[in-house]
Amino acid sequence: MLICTTLMACQGGKDNALSKGTEPMETIKKKATVPNISLYLYDDFPAQKAQMLAEALKKVYPSVSIQKEPLVLPKEYYNKERNRYSGTGLLIDLIKLRKGNAVLGLTDEVIFKANELSPTYGIFGVSSLGTCVGVISSTRPSGKQHSNDHLVKLMMHELGHSFGLDHCSNQHCFMVDAEHGNKFSQTPSFCNECQAFLNNKGWKIK
């Protein structure tokens, strides 16, 4: 399972990516429906914030829902010393909920993923490439909250990964590799190539 993490620990590899726009046409034509994107809220993630994300997503994707019952953040994924949760652990649990739909977990807690710099390296989001499963946090590792605009872009980035997109070389695309930084201010949309790939997956990006 190839896992992509967003910002502060973004490690996707283009050699492992699905080629953009190369899905056989006969496969595309067989798709009668697209998966619903289900937003799962952890603990006290604000309903108003979830609704904002859902409305933004509905502008580019035809089937979006917010699950009514919140999920509980598992204690076994909590790191007390750093006061943050394992993003990879949450991702593994979310995969079990997929059942044919796309799943995105939403949390207000800081999440982490081990890398060469730290076993509890803070990240903004994590997804499993091409499996339609991901999780994002509205709280940065610094403890500051994302603006609504940046949170929407983070959501689009992780969903792009989960639908099969790897990082993009276009510095103004949602899918650009943040390289341990924050490039949201320079990414207004998906580039034409990434947009075409997602539209072949059922998205409605104009």
Q: Where are these predicted regions, by residue range?
A:
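C-terminal motif of bacterial Sec signal peptides marking the signal peptidase cleavage site
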Residues: T6-A9
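Catalytic glutamate of the conserved HExxH
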Residues: L154-S162
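Metalloprotease/metallohydrolase-associated module, dominated by Zn2+-dependent proteases
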Residues: T27-K29, D43, T120-H150, D166-K206
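Fold-level signature of zinc-dependent metallopeptidase catalytic domains
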Residues: T33-P46
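Acidic, contiguous N-terminal accessory segments
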Residues: L18-T33
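Bacterial signal peptide processing site
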Residues: Q11-G13
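Metzincin-family zinc-dependent endopeptidase catalytic domain
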Residues: A47-L154, D166
